[in-house]
Amino acid sequence: MPRFQFRLQQYLGVKEQIEDQKELEYAKALRVVEDEKQALAELIQRRNDSVESLRQSVQKAISPVEIRRYNNNIERLKHQIAVQIERVAAAEAFAEQKRQELVQAMKERKALEIVKENAKEEFLLEANLAEQKMVDELVSFKYAEKNS
């Protein structure tokens, strides 16, 4: 029996490579999101530490210059936090875009695999029919030979 050869096998291979590439891109985008979230958490922690330090310093004798320095630092950290929140949102949007690209690549590969499976089933059906026809002809030939 001849071996099944899918005529679009190379195309399927390309689709699998594209899917692998999209998977790597999505994983990288997720790592960027996590890095940006970590940076945000660190900024928030630094701001909280500065606020707590200011509270403790106010309980002691502290000059207005020192209070202004603490406030300036806290305001700078608030601005950095706002910028970092935007960076997290941008990274999440980019990761979502990469996820959508991965989903699309998976759908395209899966559709081609379904075509391959259908072609293989059709090939096997035709091969079985050809084999059955050959067996029927052989039986008919033997029967005709026996009766002649």
Regions found by a protein language model. Give the residues of each.
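Charge-rich amphipathic alpha-helical interaction elements
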Residues: 1-148
